[in-house]
């Protein structure tokens, strides 16, 4: 499984289509929360399983994963911009099906919270990744 290819495909789709003025933070990137809006991205994949019987080189494997998009907006801006950004991100992937690598988004959920500095929204986008080997 080449998780790098999955990461690149998913992250690139969001970054290429993002229309808001928020800093985007990738996994394992050192980051101090700025005094501005920002978005944190992360992705996880399970170990997967073989889903077809076939000779070697033609066996299809399925991996399930979750893409996390966490949006932070300053309290002084109100909660609407946070909601708009996370909903835009979810809409970018709703029922999306990529080829090479094959990735199909299947489900999403969003939760909101606030702390002393930010409104934040966490989108969990579930997907299946298929690989033939």
Task: Label every model-predicted segment.
Residues 59-75, 119-130:
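Oligomerization/assembly interface segments of phage tail-like spikes and tubes
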Residues 20, 87-133:
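Acidic-leaning, charged glycine-interspersed low-complexity segments
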Residues 1-59, 77-80, 84-88, 96:
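Small/polar-rich, solvent-exposed N-terminal microdomains that initiate assembly or binding
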Residues 32, 60, 112-116:
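Sterically constrained small-residue positions within well-ordered secondary structures
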């Amino acid at each position: 499984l080449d998780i790098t290819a999955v990461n690149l495909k998913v992250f690139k789709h969001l970054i290429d289509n993002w229309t808001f003025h928020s800093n985007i933070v990738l996994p394992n990137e050192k980051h101090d929360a700025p005094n501005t809006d920002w978005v944190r991205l992360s992705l996880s994949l399970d170990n997967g399983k073989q889903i077809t019987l076939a000779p070697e080189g033609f066996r299809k494997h399925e991996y399930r994963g979750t893409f996390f998009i966490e949006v932070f907006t300053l309290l002084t801006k109100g909660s609407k911009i946070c909601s708009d950004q996370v909903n835009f991100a979810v809409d970018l992937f709703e029922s999306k099906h990529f080829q090479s690598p094959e990735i199909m988004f299947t489900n999403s959920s969003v939760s909101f919270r606030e702390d002393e500095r930010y409104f934040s929204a966490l989108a969990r986008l579930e997907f299946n990744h298929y690989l033939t080997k």
